[in-house]
């Protein structure tokens, strides 16, 4: 069974086409129009071992908000679709990842319930040209549309670039663990309810 999905989403603000392969090798082809977001999404895919293609056009003449949030929405929808009924997955994932002085922790439960807890203070309002408040918007959109429980916590860090990158890599490693097939589970759904 292939665990792939392609989502097209067009609104008056953005037009996004995204393809994901959960059993990839971390290959990416990403163009959102926001350089730093592309960099973070590349890191996410590489460390989660997802193949990820994203094409986004949007109202960047206004700001980066709509693009960042909508890419999160579509990525969450694609992840949910690619997972299907979630038979045989590990379901839970966690990681603590350093990036120089920054240390970020992420925990994921592919529970079918949307909850995002974000505890990541930034000392600067921008990294490059991107507003740092948009990282929370991205992960809330991603986690909410994937119907996952996602906790992201900054344990240490002062450099804005390092903090953001540690968060994306921690989520990537946690996601890699959660979507991985568990040979001990077989084709069972990892829930006492029998459904996720």
Curated annotation (Swiss-Prot):
Q: Which CDD domains match?
A: IGPD (cd07914)
Gene Ontology annotations of biological process type: L-histidine biosynthetic process
Q: Cellular component terms, GO, for this chain's entry?
A: cytoplasm
- Under the GO molecular function aspect, what terms does this record hold? imidazoleglycerol-phosphate dehydratase activity
Tell where it localizes: Cytoplasm
Question: Keywords for this entry?
Answer: Amino-acid biosynthesis, Cytoplasm, Histidine biosynthesis, Lyase
Q: What Enzyme Commission number(s) does the record list for this chain?
A: 4.2.1.19
Please list the reactions this protein catalyses: D-erythro-1-(imidazol-4-yl)glycerol 3-phosphate = 3-(imidazol-4-yl)-2-oxopropyl phosphate + H2O
What Pfam families does its record include? IGPD
By sequence similarity, the record places it as follows:
Belongs to the imidazoleglycerol-phosphate dehydratase family.
Listed name of the protein: Imidazoleglycerol-phosphate dehydratase
Q: What gene makes this protein? A: hisB
């Amino acid at each position: 069974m292939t665990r792939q999905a392609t989502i097209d989403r067009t609104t008056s603000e953005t037009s996004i086409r995204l393809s994901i392969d959960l059993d990839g090798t971390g290959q990416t082809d990403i163009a959102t129009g926001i350089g730093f977001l592309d960099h973070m999404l590349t890191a996410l895919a590489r460390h989660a071992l997802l193949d990820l293609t994203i094409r986004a056009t949007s109202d960047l003449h206004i700001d980066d908000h709509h693009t960042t949030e909508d890419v999160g929405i579509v990525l969450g929808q694609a992840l949910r679709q690619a997972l299907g009924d979630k038979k045989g997955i590990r379901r839970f994932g966690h990681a603590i990842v350093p990036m120089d002085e920054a240390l970020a922790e992420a925990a994921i439960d592919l529970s079918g319930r949307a909850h995002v807890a974000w505890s990541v203070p930034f000392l600067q309002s921008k990294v490059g040209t991107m507003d740092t408040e948009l990282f929370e918007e991205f992960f809330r959109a991603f986690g909410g549309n994937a119907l996952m429980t996602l906790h992201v916590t900054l344990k240490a860090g002062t450099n804005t670039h390092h903090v953001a990158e540690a968060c994306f890599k921690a989520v990537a490693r946690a996601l890699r663990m959660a979507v991985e097939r568990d040979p001990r589970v077989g084709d069972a759904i990892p829930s006492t309810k029998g459904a996720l």
